[in-house]
Amino acid sequence: MTTTENALTPDVRNGIEFKVADLSLADYGRRDIELSEQEMPGLMSLRREYHDVQPLKGARISGSLHMTVQTAVLIETLVALGAEVRWASCNIFSTQDHAAAAVVVGPHGTPEEPRGVPVFAWKGETLEEYWWAAEQALTWPPLADGTEAPANMILDDGGDATMLVLRGAQYEKAGVVPPDDEDDSAEHRVFLNLLRARFETDKTKWTKISESIKGVTEETTTGVLRLYQFAAAGDLAFPAINVNDSVTKSKFDNKYGCRHSLIDGINRGTDVLIGGKNVLVCGYGDVGKGSVESLAGQGARVTVTEIDPINALQALMEGYNVKRVEDVIGEADIVITATGNKDIITLEHMKAMKDKAILGNIGHFDNEIQIARLEKSGAIKTNIRPQVDLWTFPDTGKSIIVLSEGRLLNLGNATGHPSFVMSNSFSNQVIAQIELWTKNDEYDNEVYRLPKHLDEKVARIHVEALGGELTKLTKEQAEYIGVDVDGPYKADHYRY
């Protein structure tokens, strides 16, 4: 794929628009999807429960979430429940090309006559291609009679699709897209350029989409932060459900998923023995906890950085050192960022690292590490293998190994979280989509969380799938602790 005008035109086959790497990979992807379905009991249970009801009938869901095999099962669950779907990935490196092809072809189609879902995603997109694909996922064709039918739901991961709609509508209202700022990242410049180009051809596109959207469900910590910022500024134009803070998402996907996929990405990217290495992990939230646990399990000597004294104390009580980045960066063999914040590892930090030290990120965006400054620093980039780059500083001769250009290494260098843990997260996504679509009048333009009983429903499905057997409260026991026999069993403020 390139950024030529020809490449940035959707392919159309059998009436389906798409842009993927290779449709001939569909059979391979379908076999992988079928295996994942066996490991995703939550989604399969929801298909059985709601198939006859079709609660998402009429929903036109624009999705922006890593186009993996697991996401394919999510997409086909949404379709099975009545929705129409268009999809793009939320990361330039995270797409699994065989999964993207299989979703376009669909379970009953062929590469020559696809019958699936429009997907605009391939591994290794440029920034221009990435934002073009995001726009395609949000751009629905008119109905057969010519009536406009914009997207009416968003399923987001990181908030890019939501930001595209809300900022686009905001700039249309202002009558101008703001100029680039000298401090803007390369990606933000691409984002603004896309909005400028669209404003020249359609000055109401994003306003129409914004007015059509009934709600958004957001997958990640970073995207949720954006939603709260939009809401605080009065710019959130539709209701949002914070899926990330469902217990069966944050305490499972964020922790156990990262525990599995971080070392998978490091191993595939570098094949370096982790045991015995000094490893610095920045951030000890749920993602950091899972990351640290996996590294320590490999025999690494782990040090944590934290701003929050509570998280820092947790790390200390688990036996890890808690230090400042600048005090230990020169001793680390591997450095991992997991904060959801920006400028965690600066250019100065990178120059102070050991020769051939490994640097990677498992937070959502690439600005946790100052990649933009590294690119402008005069350091020499040598590609070692896909998504593994050696950066050499001419003034010292030292080099560092950067994984996935500072983006999610567990998806760029590996295949992300395993299916079972994603079944938890994606079950919450489906339930949240149903909630906003079927009960839209009950929600204002604010950020909500799913109620506790739905969180427990997701957990119960997966407990049973693993052969667990839940104890049943007696009526007297339930009354004694002030809960219903069938739950919810904990108050909303309970910390699991």
From Swiss-Prot:
Keywords: Cytoplasm, Hydrolase, NAD, One-carbon metabolism. One of its GO terms (biological process) is one-carbon metabolic process. It is found in: Cytoplasm. It is an enzyme of class 3 (hydrolase). It holds the Pfam family AdoHcyase. The keyword Nucleotidyltransferase does not apply. It catalyses: S-adenosyl-L-homocysteine + H2O = L-homocysteine + adenosine. Its cofactor is NAD(+). One of its GO terms (cellular component) is cytosol. Binds 1 NAD(+) per subunit. GO terms for molecular function: adenosylhomocysteinase activity. InterPro entries: Adenosylhomocyst_ase-like_sf, Adenosylhomocysteinase-like, Ado_hCys_hydrolase_NAD-bd, NAD(P)-bd_dom_sf, S-Ado-L-homoCys_hydrolase_CS. Its EC number is 3.13.2.1. Substrate binds at T68, D157, E219, K249, D253. May play a key role in the regulation of the intracellular concentration of adenosylhomocysteine. Belongs to the adenosylhomocysteinase family. HAMAP family: AdoHcyase. This is Adenosylhomocysteinase. It comes from Mycolicibacterium paratuberculosis (strain ATCC BAA-968 / K-10) (Mycobacterium paratuberculosis). The gene is ahcY.
